[in-house]
Amino acid sequence: RGFDVNTIASLPVLEGGRVKPLDSVSRNALLMIRSKSSIYHKGRFISANEWILDMMFRPSVADQQPAFVIDNPEVLGLLGIQQTSGRYYTFEAIRPRIQEIERQAQTAQQVDARARTPFQSGVVNLFDKVYLYYRLQHAMEIPGEGGLAAEMARVAGPDAAKRRDAMVQLG
């Protein structure tokens, strides 16, 4: 993948008011979203550290990885997804129904957790996972700005020489 993932995994990050290695944050987040510390996709295992790098720097790639575990058939029905032998689904499959997931979760959160139906518990659980996914994915970029790839394209675009010359004149 071009990165020394193990070195990057040891970088300190601030999470929950504490400084932790990126490795701890990535493993804990993937465990919360997927209930496992790796993703099997396209014939290979993707470590939690590779996954979080994809989340931050290649979000369109991460969106295609089956990170979300969904067991409740009614929640799958809400998403318009047929239940398969696998329990794991991509963010891309969930994305079209995010507003409905949020609406259903807000309704379900009004019910005491012990009194919720399996559907209500499942939709609240999925919303919490989607919210965590969104926060992680946008930890390094502003939503709608296109991410690192778009920024690199802007820097290398046809106006790059003009911007560089203008900055040199400022200095």
Regions found by a protein language model. Give the residues of each.
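Soluble extramembrane regions of membrane proteins in the secretory/endomembrane system
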Residues: 1-171
